[in-house]
C-alpha cells in the first residue's frame, strides 16, 4: 500500500482550513427551577430582554428578568413537561407575530398561531410585538369620524380615526356590545365603499371564557363581518404570559394596516385582565409590588400599548389605528388604580352604568360622565349641526329631573324641558346588532331636536323612529343620499328633510 504523505497533508490542511465554518453556535442554558409558568434559567449570558427562548418539546418562553446569575423566563404554554436540568436554547429573535391581510377572517392566539381549525396562515410578513409608538412629527390631529353606528356615541361622544376612546363600566353593562356593534357597522363600507374609507378590525379577547369568544366569532360570521376582522384570543385558561402578550400581538397586526396607509380599529377586551396577568407574572418574577400589588411599571404597560394607536400624516401614508380599550370597574369605582391610569392615557371615555342598563336605557351610556377629548372635529358637519344642542338639553334635563322629584308645580318652560329630555333619552336607545348609518342618525336626531317627538307619548318614540327610518329609506332616499355626499345640511336639504318628516308624521298615528 502506497502512502502519499503530500496528498494526506493537503487533505488535512484543507479540512483544517474549512473547519468550523458550518458549525452552528447555539447558546444554551439550564433550567434551575420551574413553577407557576416561570422558569429560572442559568447560562444564557447574552440573551436579550424580550427574546424568545426554546424549551425541550418545542415549548417557547420569553426572557423578562435578566439578573446577575440567572434569567427569569415566562413560559408560553404548560410548564408541566419542563423539569430542572432541561436545556434551554436561545432563538436570537425578539417575540414577533405574523401580520398582513392573510390574517383577516381568522382566529389566532397571542403568538399568531391559528386556533380556528382553518389551516395554516401563510403571512408574508412578521412584526415584533413591542414596537415603539410613532413620534410627534409623523402624527396628525384626528379629523375623520370613526362611525360606531350608535346614536348615543356618534352624536354625543364622537370617536375619530386614530383616537383612543376608553369603554369603561361594571360587568354586564354592554361594553363588548359597543365594540361588536362598531365592527358590524363597518360592513356597509366594506361592501360598497371606497378602499380609503374601509376600516379593518382587530378584536383582542383577554382572559374571557372560550364560549364568549366563540359566540363573538359566530355573530361576526353570521353577519358577514369576519372577512375584515382578526380575532386574537388569550382565554381564561391560557397562561398569564399569553394574556399579557395578546394586546401587543393584536396591536402589531393593526399597525400593519396603519403603516400601509389604511385604517384599522382595535378593541382590547379587557385591559383589567391584562394588568392582572402582568401582576401575576411580575410577582412570580419577584419584582417589587406597588399600589394594589401591581408592579411599578403597570402604567407604562398600558401607555406604551395605547400610544401606538395614532393618526399618521400624509407624508407617512395618512393611515390610522383607532383603539377602543375596555376596563371593567368594581362597583362603579372609577377611582381605582387601573381605571384612573387608563383614563389619563386615553382621549376620552364612554362610561357605562348598571343602573341605566337595568332601566332599559341601552347602550347604557352615562352622557354626563362620558367625554371625547377630540370632540366635534371627529364629526361630519351635518352631525354637528343637529347634535350640537342635544348634549346641553340632556344636561339641563338631568338637572331639572333631580329637582322635579321634590316639587309638583312646575312652570311651562320646565315642563317642556322635561318632556323633551325624556323623549331624547328614549331616542338615544338602540337595540343590539342594529347600527345605523350616519345619515340615518342625522335624520332621526333632527326629528328629535326640532320638536317632532314632543307631542308623542314616550313609549311611541321607538316606534316613530323605526317608521321614520323605513319611510326615509324608501320615500326620502334622495335626502339621505344628499346628507351622505354633502356631509352637511344646507337650507335646501333642511327644507326637504322637514317636508319628509312632516309627511311621515301625518301618517303616523
From Swiss-Prot:
EC code: 7.1.2.2
A Pfam family hit: ATP-synt_ab_N
Coiled coil: none
Molecular functions per Gene Ontology: ADP binding; ATP binding; proton-transporting ATP synthase activity, rotational mechanism
InterPro entries: ATP_synth_asu-like_sf, ATP_synth_asu_C, ATP_synth_asu_C_sf, ATP_synth_F1_a_nt-bd_dom, ATP_synth_F1_asu, ATPase_a/bsu_AS, ATPase_F1/V1/A1_a/bsu_N, ATPase_F1/V1/A1_a/bsu_N_sf
Highest taxon, organism lineage: Bacteria
SUPFAM superfamilies: C-terminal domain of alpha and beta subunits of F1 ATP synthase, N-terminal domain of alpha and beta subunits of F1 ATP synthase, P-loop containing nucleoside triphosphate hydrolases
Protein's UniProt keywords contain Translocase: yes
Location in the cell: Cell inner membrane
EC category name: translocase
Site, Required for activity: residue positions: 370
Membrane topology: Peripheral membrane protein
Binding, ATP: 169-176
The reaction(s) this protein catalyses: ATP + H2O + 4 H(+)(in) = ADP + phosphate + 5 H(+)(out)
This protein's UniProt keywords: ATP synthesis, ATP-binding, Cell inner membrane, Cell membrane, CF(1), Hydrogen ion transport, Ion transport, Membrane, Nucleotide-binding, Translocase, Transport
A Gene Ontology cellular-component term: plasma membrane
Family statement drawn from the similarity comment of this UniProt entry: Belongs to the ATPase alpha/beta chains family.
Cited function: Produces ATP from ADP in the presence of a proton gradient across the membrane. The alpha chain is a regulatory subunit.
UniProt subunit comment: F-type ATPases have 2 components, CF(1) - the catalytic core - and CF(0) - the membrane proton channel. CF(1) has five subunits: alpha(3), beta(3), gamma(1), delta(1), epsilon(1). CF(0) has three main subunits: a(1), b(2) and c(9-12). The alpha and beta chains form an alternating ring which encloses part of the gamma chain. CF(1) is attached to CF(0) by a central stalk formed by the gamma and epsilon chains, while a peripheral stalk is formed by the delta and b chains.
Entry protein name: ATP synthase subunit alpha
Species, as recorded: Sinorhizobium fredii (strain NBRC 101917 / NGR234)
Name of the gene: atpA
Amino acid at each position: 500500500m502506497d502512502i502519499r504523505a503530500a496528498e494526506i497533508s493537503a487533505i488535512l490542511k484543507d479540512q483544517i482550513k474549512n473547519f468550523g465554518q458550518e458549525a452552528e453556535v447555539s447558546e444554551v442554558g439550564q433550567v434551575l427551577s420551574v413553577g407557576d409558568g416561570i422558569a429560572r434559567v442559568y447560562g444564557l449570558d447574552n440573551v436579550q430582554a424580550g427574546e424568545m427562548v426554546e424549551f425541550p418539546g418545542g415549548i417557547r418562553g420569553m426572557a423578562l428578568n435578566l439578573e446577575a446569575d440567572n434569567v427569569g423566563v415566562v413560559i408560553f404554554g404548560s410548564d408541566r413537561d419542563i423539569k430542572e436540568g432541561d436545556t434551554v436554547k436561545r432563538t436570537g429573535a425578539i417575540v414577533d407575530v405574523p401580520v398582513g391581510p392573510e390574517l383577516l377572517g381568522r382566529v389566532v392566539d397571542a403568538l399568531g398561531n391559528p386556533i380556528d381549525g382553518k389551516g395554516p396562515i401563510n403571512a408574508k410578513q412578521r412584526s415584533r410585538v413591542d414596537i415603539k409608538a410613532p413620534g410627534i412629527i409623523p402624527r396628525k390631529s384626528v379629523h375623520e369620524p370613526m362611525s360606531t353606528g350608535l346614536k348615543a356615541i356618534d352624536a354625543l361622544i364622537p370617536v375619530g380615526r386614530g383616537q383612543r376612546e376608553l369603554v369603561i363600566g361594571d360587568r354586564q353593562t354592554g361594553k363588548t356590545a359597543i365594540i361588536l356593534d362598531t365592527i358590524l357597522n363597518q360592513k356597509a363600507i366594506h361592501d360598497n365603499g371606497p378602499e380609503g374609507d374601509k376600516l379593518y378590525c382587530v378584536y383582542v379577547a383577554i382572559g374571557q371564557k372560550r364560549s364568549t369568544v366563540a359566540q363573538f366569532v359566530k355573530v361576526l360570521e353570521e353577519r358577514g363581518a369576519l372577512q375584515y376582522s382578526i380575532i386574537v384570543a388569550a382565554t381564561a385558561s391560557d397562561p398569564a404570559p399569553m394574556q399579557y402578550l395578546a394586546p401587543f400581538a393584536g396591536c402589531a397586526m393593526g399597525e400593519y394596516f396603519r403603516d400601509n396607509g389604511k385604517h384599522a380599529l382595535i378593541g382590547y377586551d379587557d385591559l383589567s385582565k391584562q394588568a392582572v396577568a402582568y401582576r401575576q407574572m411580575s410577582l412570580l418574577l419577584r419584582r417589587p409590588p406597588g399600589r394594589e400589588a401591581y408592579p411599578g411599571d403597570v402604567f407604562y404597560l398600558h401607555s406604551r400599548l395605547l400610544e401606538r394607536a395614532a393618526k399618521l400624516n400624509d407624508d407617512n401614508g395618512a393611515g390610522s389605528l383607532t383603539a377602543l380599550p375596555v376596563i371593567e370597574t368594581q362597583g362603579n369605582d372609577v377611582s381605582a388604580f387601573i381605571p384612573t391610569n387608563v383614563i389619563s392615557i386615553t382621549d376620552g371615555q364612554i362610561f357605562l352604568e348598571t343602573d341605566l342598563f337595568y332601566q332599559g336605557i341601552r347602550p347604557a351610556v352615562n352622557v354626563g360622565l362620558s367625554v371625547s377629548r377630540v370632540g366635534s372635529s371627529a364629526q361630519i358637519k351635518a352631525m354637528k349641526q343637529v347634535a350640537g344642542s342635544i348634549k346641553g338639553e340632556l344636561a339641563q334635563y338631568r338637572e331639572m329631573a333631580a329637582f322635579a322629584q321634590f316639587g309638583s308645580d312646575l312652570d311651562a318652560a320646565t315642563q317642556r324641558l322635561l318632556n323633551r329630555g325624556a323623549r331624547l333619552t328614549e331616542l338615544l336607545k338602540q337595540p343590539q346588532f342594529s347600527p345605523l348609518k350616519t345619515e340615518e342618525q342625522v335624520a332621526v336626531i333632527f326629528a328629535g331636536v326640532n320638536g317632532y317627538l314632543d307631542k308623542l307619548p314616550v313609549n311611541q318614540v321607538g316606534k316613530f323612529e323605526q317608521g321614520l327610518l323605513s319611510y326615509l329609506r324608501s320615500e326620502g332616499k334622495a335626502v339621505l343620499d344628499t346628507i351622505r355626499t354633502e356631509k352637511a345640511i344646507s337650507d335646501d336639504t333642511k327644507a326637504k328633510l322637514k317636508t319628509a318628516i312632516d309627511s311621515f308624521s301625518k301618517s303616523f298615528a
